[in-house]
Amino acid sequence: MPKNLVIVESPAKAKTIEKFLGDDYKVMSSYGHIRDLQKKDFSIDVEHDYKPIYEIPADKKELVKQLKAEAKKADTVWLASDEDREGEAIAWHLYEVLGLTPEKTKRIVFHEITKSAILHAIETPRGIDIDRVNAQQARRVLDRIVGFELSPVLWKKIKPALSAGRVQSVAVRLIVEREKEIKNFKAEEYYRVVALLHTDNAAQPIRAELNKRLPSKEAAMEFLESCKNATFSISDLTVKPLKKSPAAPFTTSTLQQEASRKLGFTVSQTMMVAQRLYESGHITYMRTDSVNLSSLALGTIKEEIATTLGDKYYKARNYHTTAKGAQEAHEAIRPTYISHHEISGTAQEKRLYDLIWKRTIATQMADAELEKTTAEISIGGRQEKFVATGEVIKFDGFLHVYMESTDDESNDAESDTRLPELKKGETLALDEIDATQRYTQQPPRYSEAMLVKKLEELGIGRPSTYAPTISTIQNRDYVEKGEKTGTKHDICLLKLKNGKIKETKKEESYGNEKNKLIPTDVGMVVNDFLMEYFPDIMDYNFTANVEEKFDHIAEGQTKWNDEIANFYKLFHPEVEKISNLRLEHKVGERVLGTDPKTGKEVSVKIGRFGPLVQLGSTDSEEKPQFASLQKGQSVSDITLEEALKLFELPRTLGDYEGETVTVAIGRFGPYVKHGKMFVSVPKTLSPQTITLDEAVELIKNKAEAEKKRLVKTFDEEPEMEILNGPYGVYISYKKKNYKIPKDKDAAALSLDDCRAIIEEAANAPKKPRRTVRRTTKKS
């Protein structure tokens, strides 16, 4: 019988660790937290030092029973949850719930799941760090107070089922403020001027850009006219050596950003894949602020570079953490075995591991050495100059392995752009000059990676909170990830060639964006309400200062109860005051004007199922009319005219095959109705302008698709149909589907054959349901 019980957080980790320890050790998993604050209750005793009231969830009770039984049998219980604050709290909850004693309990931590790391942890146990536990407890209690106190105010003032949170609401604020910046942005016109010139000996022309933007078409035309007979010569020539240094090893946030840019992963996806890599023993702990690498890792990296690339590619480097309150772990994210260039696993795991491996190796590699040539080209009779630049990689250094990406990938840093051999004073011949109309770009919307970077810059949240925060604001429909179509402009192109200026036009779109975070109407309204009535909670500095206070608690400098008390005494009265405040209109409601036909008030607001327009007053005897906003319309900028058009629906288009054809808008968008058939109206057509012919075309297409889908019906049993589906032919009967055996000809089946298949399926033994136990999410 094993004398030692080791408890880790996840079953995958348990399996890996069990391989390293002998028969004297039994490894079990707690599947994350074994107890938490009660879900539906406030669960904080305000009268007694804000003591949290914990419960063991129903789905954890059997597990706790098993852990208690095994702990009783063991001589020593090793609590091996993660070393961050969340992991420390899990260890403390296990200690409390299992009724452990200091004599038989040891706390161990490790940053990688390797045999040497596990054995070292066993040799160097410690006690539970109660200060770290208190810091986690303070975060949990404060977030519960904010959520439980603010959410009912939102239900009362805006609509039911809304929620607020200390970090999530500030993240939404960032996205809303960026959207408002974009809305208020006024694009300014300018002309970008580029020349192609050549020397007598060069095979390729030199591309040079004018050193200033021209403000208008008139200025561009005047400039090109002056260049018709101008002389172009090299007025200055500089050659400078450049060095590029590698980026630091990955922290949680930089891994999330780089995986988003290079691999297209979401922040949550990155953390999920990294968790699997860690639990399989492939990488070190993935929640960390640190850029430090252990001396053992540095030694193996040096050996790897020297062996595979040679000594000239190696350069020892030490990196220092600059993040505020870095505390999550003591080492950066790196491969556990540097010699493992590749791993087995899923495609996602392989790609993320490859990214981590290359970044880690690059951190200890030599600088890339480049040579940058800049040529200034004077224009006879003008003050402006053309500038040509060329960059040549003399020694690739770390670029041999890895190049860090940026949010703006317009310049390819790895490109090798050479200039021909030039001399100062040399005259150049002109091939052509292009003056292209351009417009200044609006600020970009946040991608997930950009939002993580911004939150980290502001000191909001910690490595364990970035992914859950971004998931939460999307799950609660405050923010959606999507694309925005830009503004179309007719671009003027002016070309000077062979002494003549030619003008052409082309259409370009500015501001197109994909996979960006966009606030919903509900998100905008909730943000504006919280900004007006709870500015302290929404203040970036407040949220960052709270994180610092948690750090002080973790370091034992302050008592967690005192910090909570200081906050609650100011916050709670403010909540009560705002909750009781009488508002003239529901928050987010906006009066647009009066309907000229009826004289009734027209307003827009957030309804139970989303944004809508209202015709008539709620207080009047006559029931008001409601219409949902269409995709692309917003509570903040819909006009009276646009709102009134929504009340034109449903609209009768005419008759087709003896039945009326109408168009209307439902919860899922605009649709055409013909008898019992409903057909969605595509984005290319508007429900306000769709014609009968266009609607009939949609009806015919759907009828044709239905015809192909329908294999057979039975007059004696109208509810029974044989249908074609994406996974093959099947029987549909009373809202249930039944698979047709492969050896049966579906078209030849009789009603009795179908009944026999249904009866056989009903009598077949039920397959046991697979239950997947999940680790509790860290908050």
Protein language model features and the residues they cover:
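A conserved hydrophobic secondary-structure block that centers on an alpha-helix together
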Residues: 258, 262-269
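Intrinsically disordered, low-complexity regulatory segments
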Residues: 1-140, 149, 211, 317, ...
